[in-house]
């Protein structure tokens, strides 16, 4: 998958908190834990689980996740 966003950081899913509508995903990038808030549906469609390798995509207005 090719993205136009240039701020892409490789990390590992460390925390998943599923709510009724939203999901909080904690991703370890080096010594840092970055949290992304995405829809629960997106988290389920990506089949995210602890230990998954993901990319954190940071734009000026949002933080997104990509799983290859």
List the predicted regions and their residue ranges.
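Non-catalytic connector elements of ABC transporters
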Residues: 1-68
């Amino acid at each position: 998958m090719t993205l136009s966003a240039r701020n892409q950081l490789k990390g590992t899913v460390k925390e998943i908190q599923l709510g009724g509508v939203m999901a909080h995903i904690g991703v370890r990038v080096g010594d840092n834990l970055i949290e992304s808030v995405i829809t629960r549906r997106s988290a389920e469609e990506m089949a995210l689980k602890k230990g998954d390798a993901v990319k954190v995509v940071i734009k000026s207005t949002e933080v997104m996740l990509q799983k290859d």
